[in-house]
């Protein structure tokens, strides 16, 4: 088993490096910090080049995908603009939710090159148009689209926590209400989308 463990670890490291390269400008070093947000591990990579801050890459996830968990890498400039989003793992419906991994898909176009705080937020978070936000959803894949946005929101919280020292609870509750409210919001999400139709 040791024979296969080494190449698998190398392959995973290579995939991680490729994912970082896909969402960050040129860098020569990264420092990783893992936070727990909504009981999920979210890792923030602070990238530097020649000792200067180059950007942040956040390995984020959601458990609300139509086909289960979705993992992604989200890159931010030092001042919070989304550089790129790289979907690392998803099991969404082929031809519908899987489009979230396509280059230049509508979800990506809704966030790439933008500062998320300047978007139309709902309770301080990104949301798809159907939920009052301004992120365009994938056609016939609203649940997948909501899950994508959920993972981006978590990445944004982690970025703000590391880059600006905001605590994830402050960020998730919009800093005005008690942290209990955000926990309540979380639980109502997945139940509302049961029923088999990714619509």
Question: Where do the PLM segments sit?
Answer:
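Flexible, solvent-exposed loop/hinge segments and secondary-structure transition points
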Residues: 1-199
